[in-house]
Swiss-Prot record:
This is Elongation factor Tu 1. GTP hydrolase that promotes the GTP-dependent binding of aminoacyl-tRNA to the A-site of ribosomes during protein biosynthesis. The keyword Nucleotide-binding applies. Residues 19-26 are annotated as: G1. Keywords: Cytoplasm, Elongation factor, GTP-binding, Hydrolase, Magnesium, Metal-binding, Nucleotide-binding, Protein biosynthesis. The lineage of its organism: Bacteria, Pseudomonadati, Pseudomonadota, Betaproteobacteria, Burkholderiales. InterPro entries: EF-Tu_GTP-bd, EF-Tu_GTPase, EFTu-like_2, EFTU_2, G_TR_CS, P-loop_NTPase, Small_GTP-bd, T_Tr_GTP-bd_dom. Monomer. It is found in: Cytoplasm. Residues 174-176 are annotated as: G5. PROSITE patterns: G_TR_1, G_TR_2.
Length: 396
């Protein structure tokens, strides 16, 4: 049987479940897939199919994640669910599964718990733009006032981490009832209300091709009689022959013009997000450009050296350090295509960071890198990955 062709007629959105252990994230994931498959077509997934998540590698780090797909009337969703708390931390920091929005699952019987708070903070730090709340296990709570109290606590927690608590959709229901096909208000209808909230509250993300042109430099050649060719994969936007671009990072920003776009040894009039291209640059010498810089639309991205970041430090078992590190630790930070040395400043209340921890740090690089909030990086020592991070806030 041939695999069905992937018809992308509907806009695509990436989401995922977050929240405290045992509050029902995986049950909800199964319930959404099952209820929506019944209504809009697609594959129903059982709890156990989602729970034994396969291992993947992202930036040298092993993460367990389950991927589920489902559709609503207007959209196609890819949904990630992680079995363990550590997997969530790693997933969100490495950006292995970037989310356009998250579904925060909170048990009505327990209210917000430590990981509820930690996942909201992580979502804020790594730049998850929208959160929708599913108040789960409402079938176990008879007291309406108690439900309202839990709802209020969740809204306050969202506010605390700069999400709009008052405007956040909160759907009450029971993932377990929905998975069993229950037609009462807390069962299947609650899942359809959640789907409606996903469709209306999370905006359709900008496609990579619609962004401002950006291409990390992978290699630089000089071709006699033609000039300098820079190769790389276009990360976002479109580049056309004759357009002016900037070369940003490591040294002072330079301006130049693209006089040719090549792909598979053929000349094109443009390259776009996802393409591996060679760009011919006018009047640029081979020694003016190096790995670690980016080519970009003028003014669209600036070079920085000083920023705060959320990082995950690999455990010994993951091939990371065997010992903690302290203030002023100086590893390499691998951004896009190259390593830059930098020093780490720990929060005032942290004396050291143990392998397996996640922590907020401040970094100062010795050379500037083109960066934006949300940019991912690896932390390396002598070519070996010892951590992963994401830029939370740019300082300078």
């Amino acid at each position: 049987m041939a695999k069905g062709k992937f018809e992308r007629t509907k806009p695509h959105v990436n989401v995922g479940t977050i929240g405290h252990v045992d509050h029902g994230k995986t049950t909800l994931t199964a319930a959404i897939a099952t209820v929506l498959a019944k209504k809009f077509g697609g594959e129903a997934k059982g709890y156990d199919q989602i729970d034994n998540a396969p291992e993947e590698k992202a930036r040298g780090i092993t993460i367990n994640t389950s991927h589920v797909e489902y559709e609503t009337a207007t959209r196609h969703y890819a949904h990630v669910d992680c079995p363990g708390h550590a997997d969530y931390v790693k997933n969100m920091i490495t950006g292995a599964a970037q989310m356009d929005g998250a579904i925060l699952v909170c048990s009505a019987a327990d209210g917000p718990m430590p990981q509820t708070r930690e996942h909201i903070l992580l979502a804020r730090q790594v730049g998850v733009p929208y959160i929708i709340v599913f108040l789960n296990k409402c079938d176990m709570v008879d007291d309406e006032e108690l439900l309202e109290l839990v709802e209020m606590e969740v809204r306050e927690l969202l506010d605390k981490y700069d999400f709009p608590g008052d405007d956040t959709p909160i759907i009450r229901g029971s993932a377990k009832l929905a998975l069993e096909g229950d037609q009462s208000d807390k069962g299947e209808p609650a899942i359809l209300r959640l789907a409606e909230a996903l469709d209306t509250y999370i905006p359709t993300p900008e496609r990579a091709v619609d962004g401002a042109f950006l291409m990390p430099v992978e290699d630089v050649f000089s071709i006699s009689g033609r000039g300098t060719v820079v190769t790389g994969r276009v990360e976002r936007g479109i580049i056309k022959v004759g357009e002016e671009i900037e070369i940003v990072g490591i040294r002072d920003t330079q301006k130049t013009t693209v006089t040719g776009v090549e792909m598979f040894r053929k000349l094109l009039d443009q390259g776009q997000a996802g393409d591996n291209v060679g760009l011919l640059l006018r009047g640029t010498k081979r020694e003016d450009v190096e790995r670690g810089q980016v080519l970009c639309k003028p003014g669209s991205i600036k070079p920085h050296t000083h920023f705060t970041a959320e990082v995950y430090v690999l455990s010994k078992d993951e091939g990371g350090r065997h010992t903690p590190f302290f203030n002023n630790y100086r590893p390499q930070f691998y951004f896009r295509t190259t390593d830059v040395t930098g020093s780490i400043e720990l929060p005032a209340d942290k004396e050291m960071v143990m392998p397996g921890d996640n922590v907020s740090i401040t970094v100062k690089l010795i050379n500037p890198i083109a960066m934006e909030e949300g940019l991912r990086f690896a932390i390396r020592e002598g070519g070996r990955t010892v951590g992963a991070g994401v830029v939370a806030k740019i300082i300078a």
